[in-house]
Amino acid sequence: MKTIKQLVLTSILVLFASAVFAETKMRITLQLPLKAHLGQNLLVFKKELEKRSDIIVEIYDSAQLYKDKEVPQAVGSGAIEAGVASLTRFAGTNPEVDIFYLPFLFDSEKKIRKATKSGSKIRQVLDPAISKSGAVPLYYQAYGSAVMLSNGTPMNTPAAFKNKKIRVFGKTLGAFVSSLGAKPALISGSEQYLAYQRGTVDAGMTGVSGVKSRKLYQVMDTLTVTNHGDIEFVLVANQKWLNSLTKKQRKAITEASKIAEKAVRDDMSGIEARAYKEAEDNGMKIIKLSSAELKALKNASSSVIADYIERTGGKGGVGDKLVKAANKL
């Protein structure tokens, strides 16, 4: 009898140990601090996913594991299950993803919502292209519109850009400042504070929420509201890891993604408003463009769209079709 009891107890312990070791983890790398709105949004995703499944979500923020530029390779290779990267990080192999960074193309929240909605004509092209890298888009994280940061002089005219070295975070954004006579410097988000502090660049661009989360008002004193591009981040997951999950687990990820995507998109206007207030409260001058200044910047940078179309297949190519789809939104 004692032997039977021992066997039963051993079996229970083995089953318990197996369950522990079989625990499914989803590690997510993020370049921003957890307190930033993208980090807070990942907490929404974590809560919703863990509520619906046995997947345990672990978030590694502040580029602890990978910098933004390293995320596509890390996730695509399976070095980590998932990660958040700015959309432009996939432009090396898929230049069409830079559609959102074309100057002044998405000039209203309505257009941005339509373009980034799951299943939109634009995402029907972008998501499969990104997935070829082995990193599958789960959902887009709104980061807001791109603004310009500088010291002393606002960046409100083409002349203000001339001969300045400017921090950018993508090739197409680099083409934008080049078209205005500036010199682009590709610097990751986690390194921009030091670049401004050390004077490595004369000016820079970012999403206004980054001014708050990274305390950029400590090193730059002027914010020009150009809204020249729509900054999108994307949570991607490794394709092989996704395929290894059960149908129930994948369904839970899809449901959690939908909730988190809607949450960050709906709160974007409030996030930006709070960021502008904090920037102003900390001494930053907020400069808004006049209609004449906006027109001048738009006209001076129009060649960027033509160059994008040429780089993505020319007339009738994928980029041309995306630009036309964007103009119809």
Positions of predicted regions on the chain:
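Sec/Tat signal peptide C-region and signal peptidase I cleavage site
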Residues: 15-22
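Ser/Thr/Gly-rich flexible loops in soluble cytosolic domains mediating phosphotransfer, phosphorylation
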Residues: 115-117
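N-terminal secretory/targeting leader peptides
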Residues: 23-112, 121-123, 128-329
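Bacterial N-terminal signal peptides that target proteins for export
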Residues: 1-8
